[in-house]
């Protein structure tokens, strides 16, 4: 017992959930999630712990508007995994779901939406519409992948230096 003592429990902190992997059994238990506190298990099994608090990640997506003008959106993605579905998330995507799923998906969706607007529309009256479309598409795509997108915030719209120079010279 002394030898295996530290390998027989995991202390799950507030804002975390755990899923258990049975090495000699059926593998990952996707049905049960473990909450905060000390959780015991046999030493050959493993507890995988996920942070389920709301998180924010900054991302920049480079693309072209409907006229082919190079522009970029700097965005903040506010998200968290679905607490009771982290076993499924771990089984289908893994612990690095931000890099494997969220970042590629925001890139694809933002590029698709950006090219439907002109740069002038993006910086003026259509910015909120653009944000809302990206947000709704992300929510729909990732809900079935066990991730909740709370909000997408556009923090900056960036254009190429040549275009910016031409605008300031006018």
Q: What are these language model-derived features?
A:
Residues 67, 78, 98-162:
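Amphipathic, coiled-coil-like alpha-helical scaffolding segments used for oligomerization/assembly
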């Amino acid at each position: 017992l002394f030898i295996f003592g530290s390998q027989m429990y995991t202390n799950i902190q507030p804002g975390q959930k755990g899923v258990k992997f049975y090495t000699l059994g059926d593998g990952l238990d996707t049905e049960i999630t473990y909450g905060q506190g000390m959780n015991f298990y046999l030493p050959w099994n493993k507890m995988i712990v996920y942070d389920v608090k709301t998180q924010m990640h900054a991302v920049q997506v480079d693309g072209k508007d409907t006229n082919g003008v190079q522009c970029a959106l700097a965005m903040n993605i506010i998200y968290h995994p679905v607490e009771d579905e982290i076993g499924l998330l771990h089984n289908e995507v893994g612990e690095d779901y931000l890099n494997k799923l969220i970042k590629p998906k925001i890139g694809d969706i933002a590029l698709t939406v950006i090219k439907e607007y002109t740069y002038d529309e993006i910086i003026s009256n259509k910015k909120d519409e653009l944000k809302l479309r990206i947000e709704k598409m992300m929510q729909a795509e990732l809900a079935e992948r066990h991730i909740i997108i709370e909000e997408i915030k556009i923090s900056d719209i960036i254009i190429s230096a040549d275009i910016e120079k031409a605008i300031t010279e006018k």
